[in-house]
Amino acid sequence: MKFIDEAKIEVAAGKGGNGATSFRREKFVPRGGPDGGDGGKGGSVWAEADENTNTLVEYRFVKRYQAKNGEKGHGSDRYGAGADDIVLKMPVGTLIRDLDTDEIVADLTYHGQRVCLAKGGKGGLGHIHFKSSVNRAPKQSTPGEEGETRSLQLELKVLADVGLLGMPNAGKSTLITAVSAARPKIANYPFTTLHPNLGVVRIDENHSFVMADIPGLIEGAAEGAGLGHRFLKHLSRTGLLLHVVDLAPFDEAVDPAEEALAIINELRKYDEELYGKPRWLVLNKLDMLDEEEAQERTVTFLEAVGWDYPKPDDRFQFDMETPRLFQISALTHQGTQELVHQINQYLTEKKRLEAEKAEAEKAAANVEIIEQQPKTDTGVFKPE
């Protein structure tokens, strides 16, 4: 199935049914009073996150979604039937934005999450509601309310813990294949990866994380060159970036350091927030070099890019803020287990710190609420 990560649609909820104007007419009841019922509600349009849906391709071909109107009210005080709602299945990670107001309507972040996109109109009142002591035979009823109509932008941003970035043919797809069950297309030509691939990296029964591989970047990507610029947004939800570098390019004229600096420059031009994310350096394709040459190229590369952080052989206790460097061969799996182990440690600690921060903020908010409560001279809260 073709991977589509953007679409524009229009959703229209149904109109409420009109209230009825009707009088009771039965044998032996010649002057029956009003008995017109209310109209039914119009159908609403909902979005639902579905983990089994992974593209917005359906919304490229069907642009308008219209719910049905509610049924009008009936005599004998019978209400009109309400119209059924429409539920639009969308991939987890879909961001929905109102095109008219630029307001974010919803961010679908978990399976089963439901959000109302357009609310159906209420049914009109039947004239039974207008009967009074001075007006025993009212003839007015109210029409149903109009349903909401919205023009929406759908934008899919895949949900992953770790994102891979690098030049085409840096070995990103080979890496995600080596550490997960993902099987992206791999070949010896640029832009083999044409859309994001996700792989679940399982550490044990209780620990796993999701890795995202996007098409390779080239110089000028921030201005639209190549394929990767369209998919950089898919890295915005990640907690960690792995910058994969081909340390042994087939073309001897290619300088890995220049390519790495070009990637960093494109990242900065595209989005400062994305540029500021934690980013580790992964030097790949060591299987193409002997040990001495690999060491020489690593030293030359680190000097050229101005790497001022610990080297793999340094005895150093990594903290959450320090970028890390790894030397691997995704093809032979050399060094990949250590990489996966450290990623898991980092993500586990990151989640723990975020949970502690959220708990502290919640406690501080509760204290502030208590302090704002009015008190008597004795310090006892005044009853509301």
From Swiss-Prot:
Record's subcellular location: Cytoplasm
A GO biological process held by the record: ribosome biogenesis
CDD domains documented for this protein: Obg
Keywords tagged on the record: Cytoplasm, GTP-binding, Hydrolase, Magnesium, Metal-binding, Nucleotide-binding
Highest taxon listed in the record's lineage: Bacteria
Biased composition (Gly residues): 33-43
Positions of transmembrane segments: none
Xref: InterPro entries: G_OBG, GTP-bd, GTP-bd_Obg/CgtA, GTP1-OBG_CS, GTP1_OBG_dom, GTP1_OBG_dom_sf, OBG_GTPase, P-loop_NTPase
Biological role stated in the UniProt entry: An essential GTPase which binds GTP, GDP and possibly (p)ppGpp with moderate affinity, with high nucleotide exchange rates and a fairly low GTP hydrolysis rate. Plays a role in control of the cell cycle, stress response, ribosome biogenesis and in those bacteria that undergo differentiation, in morphogenesis control.
Assembly, per entry: Monomer.
PANTHER family recorded: DEVELOPMENTALLY REGULATED GTP-BINDING PROTEIN-RELATED, MITOCHONDRIAL RIBOSOME-ASSOCIATED GTPASE 2
Protein name according to UniProt: GTPase Obg
